[in-house]
Each structure stands twice: as structure tokens, then as C-alpha cells.
């Protein structure tokens, strides 16, 4: 019986010539045309046992592919060009791809030009980017490859600070490619992370490129009232879907987002004041009742800073309160601050440089009802008076933007809405052009370059140019609207001395 001799790494294997003749694959057709009898055909880059498996497939149309042998069989099938076996191997590898092997699969697919495996491994890296940074192979990704991965619209990062930590870890292994840092968008980063990068001697150039990472864009949470039940919905920029998170039957409450959880504070249920605070995780949709506030109150002013929820003032039955307290996320104890100088409800509170500013609202007792224009600032553990607002306002909505405060007033006793800017360093109020007039609730959010206002429609106000853009949007029955990013960066005053500790904490929090 005639046979063809193959030599693989010094080992000889004889193959019946009839198998070669019957083969439909180009590799074996070429052997039929050019093979010289008795001359061994040397096969390089192929495993002996993998070649045996391919011969079995040619004989019986069956092949035993496992996790342990799939790579060597695939290499042999690619070199010898047996498409059915290539497809079987690729399917096996894709089925078993995970965050611990996806970079190796990615490199393997590039080496042998396997597009399906390349796409699947790239998708796995994109979906598990924070986990794959622990892979020793992560630092071997090229600058262009990492740029492609981090520029993908669906890369699984939920804040630009996370992108920064991924880049810093890669730069540690690739110090000659520090300019990759320019793919960051500083306007989506915290000041703390920007300072840390600056202390490392890195400079982020101002980018005019569009933001491609959907996950770092603003999430939206909306509470809408319908038939006495309010429905909570959450919009994820990464998935581009709205999901129903849950319902609440409260009225006259306030709400805030902190660490991807929505806190619903105080208010009334069935016309009765409550002092409980409920929290729903916007990702898992799980509810938790946290420790009660110090008293029953509604129409409180709330703000968040450094992982803490602050509740200030409010209405205790018919009397305004000056109580100020905060709850740190993940803890169960409310911490009291000194009381406000002037008790109030329905005012606004906002943080600027770790100081709390409270403005406007109503001071009321059983005998008095006073609409306020005064402003208080909590700094160095005490409340101090600041320059009053230009007018008295019972309803105020305020937001910090670029180190100053922008305040929009509601309409009750007033005849129209007002827009003010409070210049913090000068303790000075100035009045700005107000584009619209709206009777009813409003919601104000800081969104990078602009301030978003939800009123009778959607408005974008650009402070630097003092311009407005109007968008048609149904706002009926909206009880709460907020845009937020998932900021969980440890907050501290980063210095050269504290920088290693800060980066270590960020790596543990973001990348493990």
C-alpha cells in the first residue's frame, strides 16, 4: 500500500495515499501534484498529535476537540487549511472565552488571522475591561489596540476616572506612550483624578473629539406620578434603554442619587409625614429602608458630597425646622450638624468646595410665614451669613457650576422666574437673562458644558456664552429628574505624599 511520509518535529507519520487522493482540501491536492515518492514532507509549526486528529477527521469526519487541545488543532487546521475544523475549533474557543483568557485569545486570533475569534475576544475585553487589567498580558497590548478598545462606544466603564486608572496602569508598563492619556475627557473626570494625573507629570490636551464611551455619559433617573403611584425609571447611556426600577407612594419628598442608588427622603404618605428614608439600587433594583431621620419632615433640601447625603431644613407639620444632618452611604447613623441660623423649608442647598450653601425658602411658625432671601454657608463647622439673594424667593433650585452657584427661582408669590449667578469668591449675586417662565416644578442638573433645566420643556443653558437652547419634551407629571455619572472616586486632597495611596485605593475600587 502506497503511503505519503510526513515529518513533524523529527517524528515520522505515514499516511495512506488514498486518503490524500480523496481529500478535497487544497493542501493535499498540491501534495498530489508536486510530491516526489519516498521524500518526506516536512511540516513546520504543527503539532504531531494535532495532525493525527486532522487525519482522523479526513477518514471519519469526526474529531475530538477539547479545551486542552483546541488551540493546537486550530493552528494545524489553519496552516493546512481545513475550514470545517477551523470553524469547529473557533466555536469551541468562543464558547469558552472569559475575562481571564480573552487577551490571550485576542493575541492568538491576530497571529493566525481568525476574524470571528478576534471579534469575540475583543467584545469580551470591552465587556470586562476592568477585570482584564489584572492579566499580565494587558500591558502588552499596543497603544493602538488599547485606544481602539477604550474608544469603543460600549466599553464597560461607568466613569472617566475608571478610564484614567486603566490608562495609568498600562502606562506603567509602557512609559514611552504616555500620550495615550489624551483620549481622556477631563470634563467627565473628578477634580481629584485630574489633580492626581497632573501630579504624575502627565498633561491631558484639550480634546475636540466626540465622546465615544457611552458609559461615562450621564445616566438619567426620572420619577413620574400616575394615579397616586410614582414610577421610577432609569436610563443607561451604555445600553441606551429605559428600565423601570420600582414605585413609591410618597408625596412632597426629595430625592438624590448617591453611588448609583436613589435615596427618597421624607415627605408624606397618605397625608401623614414620615421620617424614613428609602434607597433603591438602580442596577439591582433592590430596595432598602435606611435609618430614619431625626424627625418627621417634608419639603427638605438635600445635597450630596463625598459619599454623604445631607438633609437640611424642612417642614415639621406646620413649622419650618433648622435641623441639618447627614448620612454616609453604606452606614446607618445620621450625624447632626449645627442648626441653620434661620429655619426654612423649600429652599435650595448646594456644595461648593466642600462648603454647603443654603438659600431662599420659607420660614414659618404657627404665627409667621416669611419668604426668605438670605443665604447661609456651612464652613469650618459653623453656619455664617452670606450676601442675600436680590429678591425673596420661596422656591429655589440651585446648582454648582465651575466653582460658582447658579440659582433658578420657582413661581409662587413671584410673577416670573429669575436666574441668578452667585460668584463665590466675591460673595456677590448678579442677575442673568431668564429664557422662559414656568409655574410648577423644575429640575436643574449640571452636565459638563451646560446646565440642564427641566420645566415645561427641556432647556440647556450655557453659562460661558449665556445662551439657551430649547428642546421639545413632555414633562407632564414629572416629580423628580436628575442626570448623574457613577462617581465613586475616593475623595481627598491629593498631594505628592498621598498620591500612591490614592492611586492604590482607586485601583482596588475600580480594577479589582
Swiss-Prot record:
It holds the Pfam family BACK. Keywords: Kelch repeat, Repeat. The keyword Manganese does not apply. Residues 102-176 form the BACK domain. Residues 2-67 form the BTB domain. Coiled coil: none annotated. Kelch repeats lie at residues 216-261, 262-307, 309-354, 356-403, 405-449, 452-498. The keyword Repeat applies. It comes from the Viruses. Belongs to the poxviruses Kelch family. This is Kelch repeat protein C2. It comes from Camelpox virus (strain CMS).
Amino acid at each position: 500500500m502506497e503511503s505519503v511520509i510526513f515529518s513533524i518535529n523529527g517524528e515520522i507519520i505515514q499516511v495512506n495515499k488514498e486518503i490524500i487522493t480523496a481529500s478535497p482540501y487544497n493542501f493535499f491536492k498540491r501534495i498530489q501534484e508536486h510530491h516526489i515518492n519516498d521524500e518526506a514532507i516536512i511540516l513546520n509549526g504543527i503539532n504531531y498529535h494535532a495532525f493525527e486528529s486532522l487525519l482522523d477527521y479526513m477518514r471519519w469526519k469526526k474529531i475530538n476537540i477539547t479545551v486542552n487541545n483546541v488551540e493546537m488543532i486550530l493552528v494545524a487546521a489553519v496552516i493546512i487549511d481545513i475550514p470545517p475544523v477551523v470553524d469547529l475549533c473557533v466555536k469551541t474557543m468562543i464558547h469558552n472565552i472569559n475575562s481571564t483568557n480573552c487577551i490571550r485569545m485576542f493575541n492568538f486570533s491576530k497571529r493566525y488571522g481568525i476574524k470571528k475569534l478576534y471579534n469575540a475576544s475583543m467584545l469580551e475585553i470591552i465587556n470586562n475591561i476592568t477585570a482584564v487589567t489584572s492579566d499580565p498580558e494587558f500591558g502588552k497590548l499596543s497603544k493602538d489596540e488599547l485606544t481602539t478598545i477604550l474608544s469603543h462606544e460600549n466599553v464597560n466603564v461607568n466613569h472617566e476616572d475608571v478610564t484614567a486608572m486603566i490608562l495609568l496602569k498600562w502606562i506603567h508598563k509602557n512609559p514611552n506612550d504616555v500620550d495615550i492619556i489624551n483620549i481622556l475627557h477631563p470634563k467627565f473626570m473628578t477634580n481629584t483624578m485630574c489633580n492626581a494625573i497632573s501630579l504624575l507629570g502627565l498633561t491631558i490636551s484639550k480634546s475636540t473629539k466626540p465622546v465615544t464611551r457611552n458609559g461615562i455619559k450621564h445616566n438619567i433617573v426620572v420619577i413620574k406620578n400616575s394615579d397616586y403611584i410614582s414610577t421610577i425609571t432609569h436610563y443607561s447611556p451604555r445600553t441606551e434603554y429605559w428600565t423601570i426600577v420600582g414605585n413609591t407612594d410618597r408625596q412632597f419628598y426629595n430625592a438624590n442619587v448617591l453611588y448609583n442608588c436613589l435615596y427618597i427622603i421624607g415627605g408624606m404618605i397618605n397625608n401623614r409625614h414620615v421620617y424614613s428614608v428609602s434607597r433603591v439600587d438602580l442596577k439591582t433594583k433592590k430596595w432598602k429602608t435606611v435609618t430614619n431621620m431625626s424627625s418627621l419632615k417634608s419639603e427638605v433640601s438635600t445635597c450630596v458630597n463625598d459619599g454623604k447625603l445631607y438633609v437640611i431644613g424642612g417642614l415639621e407639620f406646620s413649622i419650618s425646622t433648622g435641623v441639618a444632618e447627614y448620612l454616609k452611604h453604606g452606614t446607618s447613623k445620621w450625624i447632626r450638624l449645627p442648626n441653620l441660623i434661620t429655619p426654612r423649608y423649600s429652599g435650595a442647598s448646594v456644595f461648593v468646595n466642600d462648603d454647603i450653601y443654603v438659600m431662599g425658602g420659607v420660614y414659618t411658625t404657627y404665627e409667621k410665614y416669611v419668604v426668605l432671601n438670605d443665604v447661609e454657608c456651612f464652613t469650618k463647622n459653623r453656619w455664617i451669613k452670606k450676601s442675600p439673594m436680590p429678591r425673596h424667593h420661596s422656591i429655589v433650585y440651585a446648582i454648582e457650576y465651575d466653582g460658582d452657584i447658579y440659582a433658578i427661582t420657582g413661581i409662587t408669590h413671584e410673577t416670573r422666574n429669575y436666574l441668578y449667578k452667585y460668584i463665590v469668591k466675591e460673595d456677590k449675586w448678579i442677575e442673568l437673562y431668564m429664557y422662559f417662565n414656568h409655574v410648577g416644578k423644575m429640575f436643574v442638573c449640571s452636565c459638563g458644558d451646560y446646565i440642564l433645566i427641566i420645566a415645561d420643556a427641556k432647556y440647556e443653558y450655557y453659562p460661558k456664552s449665556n445662551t439657551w437652547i430649547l428642546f421639545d419634551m413632555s414633562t407632564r407629571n414629572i416629580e423628580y429628574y436628575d442626570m448623574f455619572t457613577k462617581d465613586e472616586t475616593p475623595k481627598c486632597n491629593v498631594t505628592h505624599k498621598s498620591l500612591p495611596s490614592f492611586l492604590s485605593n482607586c485601583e482596588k475600587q475600580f480594577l479589582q
